[in-house]
Amino acid sequence: MKKFIIGIAAAVLVSTAAHAETIGASMAVFDDKFGTLLRNGMEDYAKTLDGVDLQIEDALNDVAKQQSQIQNFIAAGVDAIIVQPVDTDATTVMSKLAADAGIPLVYVNREPVNIDTLPEKQAFVASNEVDSGTLQTREICKLLDGKGKAVVIMGELSNQAARMRTKDIHDVLATDQCKGIEIVQEQTANWQRTQGADLMTNWLSAGIEFDAVIANNDEMAIGAIQALKAAGRSMDSVVIGGIDATDDALAAMAAGELDVSVFQDAVGQGKGSIDAALKLSKGEAVERKIYIPFELVTKANLAEFQGKN
């Protein structure tokens, strides 16, 4: 009888282990405001799931390191891999590594360059960047009454989101309603608050005149705000817009410093990436592109988004 009971217990343990799912995730860099929200959302969601082990690694903004992490996940025999790419132009190699190993791969937040040719059992979860810069720039155009001068602060140039958001800006400013707005400067600050502040300081020192700051994310917009305040510029004299609707950005909006942001649902993207990875690991079909909607944030609807990111 004792042997029979032990046998049943062992079978239960084996069955439980067989159904456990291990997901390896390589994030572009931990030291990033939105990336931290995304990572925390993934970790919190994974904790609510029975039998799911989420292992997250920091790629430290190093493409070679990220590829090595993917190779290590493959060698460890994980059931699925999630990647927030360091360089969206380097994803073809990552896709091949996972496809050759027969392991599902989900890209999150940053669109891979090979999005239209992803192998089977691979997907992309994010928000549609056609909407992000478009929502942002249309609102800024409205606040400027369709005329004035603007400076543009771009994210990392190797990143598809930065390129797309910047294209959105140009597309909106080319419309009849907004073609009276001239871009007088356009440079990168690599998504970073400190670099955004440094860039704005340089523009102010050079005597660049502008009526609006259009930044590819909130962190760079906040950096620009800090530099403007340090230079004694009134926040009422300039329209400033970012993207992400982070807690810091919404605090700046409540203080009358930031005028426009666009909510990017970090928690929703994280949850969606894990759900897609689990479905693919079980042989279930998912859409190649899974979009979590962007939403415009202004002072009028600020309260709806506080505490979401």
UniProtKB/Swiss-Prot annotation:
GO terms for molecular function: carbohydrate binding. It holds the Pfam family Peripla_BP_4. It comes from Rhizobium meliloti. The keyword Lipoprotein does not apply. Its main location: periplasm. Involved in rhizopine (L-3-O-methyl-scyllo-inosamine) catabolism. Could be involved in its high affinity transport. Belongs to the bacterial solute-binding protein 2 family. GO terms for cellular component: periplasmic space. It is found in: Periplasm. InterPro entries: Peripla_BP_I, SBP_2_dom. Keywords: Periplasm, Signal, Transport. This is Putative rhizopine-binding protein. The keyword Secreted does not apply. Residues 1-20 form the signal peptide.
